[in-house]
C-alpha cells in the first residue's frame, strides 16, 4: 500500500485537503485526531504529560487549555511535549496502516503536521505539502479560528518555513483559491499516485 505523507503549516487547509483523497479510495490518517484521542483516552500518556506538566490532567484527561497556557508562557517546552506525544502517535499510526493494508486500500494519506520536522518523510513513499499565502493563512487562523496572534507566531516558530516545505515536497497543493480548484489539484495528484509502486511499508515498517 502506498504511503503518502501530507503536511502543511497551521491554517493551510491541510486536513480539509487530506479528506478530499477519500473520494479516490485513499484511507486518511489524521495525526491531530490521534493526539486528541490520546489526550482523552491513553492513561499512560496522560500520566506522563501530567508528570511533565503538573495540573494538565483534569477529570482524567489532558486539558488542552492548560497545556496551551503553559506553552504560551514557555514555548521552549513544545519540544518536551512532542517527545512524549510523537512516539505514541507513531504506534497508533502503524496500527492504522496495518488495518488499511488488511482492507486492501490502494493508499494511505498520513496527515502529519510535523512530517519534515520529525524526519517522517523517510517513512513514506511520497510527500505532499498543502500551502497558501501568508494573508490567507492569517485570515483562517486569527480571524476565523480566533487563535491568539502571539500563540500563532509561537506555533509557526516550531514549524519549518512554508517555502522550505514546498521545496522538499514531491507535490504541492495550493488552497488559495476555491474548493473546486483544490479538488482538481487533488484529483490530478491522486491519478499520479495510483501509478506508483509502494516501497516504504516493506522498507521501514514491515520488518
Specify the residue positions occupied by each region the protein language model found.
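Small-molecule kinase domains that catalyze NTP-dependent phosphoryl transfer to phosphate-bearing small molecules
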Residues: 93, 122-123, 143, 147-194, ...
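Hydrophobic anchor at the beta1->P-loop junction of P-loop NTPases
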Residues: 6
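ATP-dependent NMP and nucleoside kinases share a basic, alpha-helical "lid"
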Residues: 94-103, 107-144
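The conserved Walker
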Residues: 10
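ATP-dependent small-molecule kinase phosphotransfer cores
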Residues: 33-105
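Post-Walker A helix-loop "phosphate-sensing" segment adjacent to the P-loop in P-loop NTPases
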Residues: 22-31, 43-44
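Walker A/P-loop
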Residues: 15
Amino acid at each position: 500500500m502506498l504511503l503518502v505523507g501530507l503536511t502543511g503549516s497551521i491554517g493551510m487547509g491541510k486536513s480539509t485537503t487530506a479528506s478530499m483523497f477519500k473520494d479516490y479510495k485513499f484511507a486518511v490518517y489524521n495525526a491531530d485526531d490521534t493526539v486528541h484521542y490520546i489526550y482523552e483516552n491513553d492513561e499512560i500518556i496522560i500520566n506522563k504529560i501530567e508528570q511533565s506538566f503538573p495540573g494538565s490532567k483534569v477529570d482524567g484527561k489532558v486539558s488542552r487549555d492548560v497545556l496551551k497556557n503553559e506553552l504560551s508562557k514557555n514555548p521552549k517546552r513544545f519540544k518536551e511535549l512532542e517527545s512524549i506525544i510523537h512516539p505514541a502517535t507513531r504506534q497508533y499510526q502503524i496500527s492504522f496502516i496495518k488495518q488499511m493494508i488488511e482492507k486492501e486500500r490502494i493508499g494511505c494519506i498520513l496527515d502529519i503536521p510535523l512530517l519534515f520536522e520529525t524526519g517522517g518523510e523517510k517513512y513514506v513513499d511520497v510527500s505532499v505539502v498543502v500551502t497558501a499565502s501568508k494573508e490567507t493563512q492569517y485570515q483562517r487562523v486569527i480571524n476565523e479560528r480566533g487563535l491568539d496572534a502571539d500563540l500563532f507566531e509561537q506555533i509557526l516558530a516550531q514549524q519549518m518555513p512554508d517555502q522550505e516545505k514546498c521545496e522538499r515536497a514531491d507535490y504541492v497543493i495550493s488552497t488559495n483559491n476555491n474548493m473546486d480548484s483544490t479538488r482538481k489539484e487533488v484529483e490530478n495528484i491522486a491519478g499520479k499516485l495510483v501509478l506508483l509502486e509502494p516501497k516504504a511499508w516493506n522498507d521501514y515498517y514491515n520488518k
